[in-house]
Amino acid sequence: IDTSLLTEFYFEERIPALRGCVAVGSGSSNWSLDRMLYPFAGFAPPGGSCYSVAAGGHFSGGGYGLMSRLDGMVVDHIAGIELVTLDEKGVANTILVTENDTGEKGELFWALRGGGGGNFGVVTRFYLRPCQRRNAVKLSTLSFPWESNTESGLDTDKLAALIKAYGAYWETHNSPLPDDPNNELFALMR
């Protein structure tokens, strides 16, 4: 089922339990959320960095990303989820589950947030509580050529040395202490 056209986002004002949340269509990509939601709502969810991955799959799987060390995973900020299910007669029903629900709806809310593969219906919309606003984020990127048998290229031995140095750097420079400026470091090797 293609949800790529479900890309709207807005401040929810109609549903009392979700008032003040930002409603995000499940087809919204990580890139569009970061690019559009931050100027619109003053925050971006702490989700992934793959620009083409959409909220429907990423959020349902937990939503780990570059800002997760600071703000948790995206599922930590989901207050509600709208989905379409089929009843026993094959009739489509739109269901809204929220963090305040109990019983079957509460269990469904839990399962849709990374607890069971997200295959309980077609998620059409997420409702996110705002994360802390970040005025600046530092990003550093290093690229290495992969051509072997050249002085600047990475052969197997150079790659092994790079990975070992990379791991040693993060092991000594990353801090779990909340007041340490290095507690916000995030490493990604692609």
Residue ranges, per PLM feature:
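C-terminal cap/substrate-recognition region of VAO/PCMH-type FAD-linked oxidoreductases
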Residues: 94-190
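FAD-binding glycine-rich core of flavoenzymes that anchor FAD
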Residues: 1-108, 168
